[in-house]
Amino acid sequence: MANFSDFYFDSSTGKNRIYVRQWSPEGEPRGIVQIEHGIAEHIERYDDFARFLADNGFIVVGDDHLGHGKSIDNGGEQGFFAESDGWDYVVWDIDRLHDIMHEKYPDLPYIFFGHSMGSFLVRTYIIRHPEKPDAVIISGTGHQPLPMVLGGLAMASAAVKLYGAHKIGNTLNNVAFGAY
């Protein structure tokens, strides 16, 4: 039966604290799986999956990203990463969690699991840090043609300039998620 514990670390923003849940196996661990959740999710949604992995010998760890789950209670705002460079802050926090766990268990294989938005975060992470993971699992990811990505970025940038970074934009939300 897996055990779990919680801890926090200081976010790379310098303003927030990031909530972490860790599930541990009863016996000797055979590896570490770091879960990166999707948009509008939190790490505790992965409890059944994490317990399954822990019951099969893995240490499982995952954080609530900036603006998600219990990280909101520590200086965050729901769904909001940062005024600027928000994506980078989340990727830096992912790296910090990796480093915390790798310091504790330097000899264990390290696996990243990213779902939905978490898959894009993990994809960014492995581009920046290809030497750190031993394996990567990408779930529920996607791909858009470059013109659509550039158009979406232009729309988002214009909306931030017009309304500010904290405004929830229904038009942009519908364009981004309407098909889902």
Language model region names:
Residues D64, I111, A135-I137:
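Residue in the alpha/beta-hydrolase core beta-strand immediately N-terminal to the catalytic nucleophile
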Residues M1-G27:
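N-terminal cap/lid segment of alpha/beta-hydrolase-fold proteins
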Residues Y105-S116:
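Alpha/beta-hydrolase fold nucleophile elbow
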Residues V33, H37-E41:
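Active-site glycine-rich loops that stabilize anionic/oxyanionic intermediates
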Residues D48-G76:
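Conserved alpha/beta-hydrolase
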Residues G114-T124:
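Glycine-rich nucleophile elbow surrounding the catalytic serine of serine-hydrolase chemistry
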Residues A82-H102:
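Alpha/beta-hydrolase active-site loop
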Residues T124-Y180:
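Alpha/beta-hydrolase-fold enzymes
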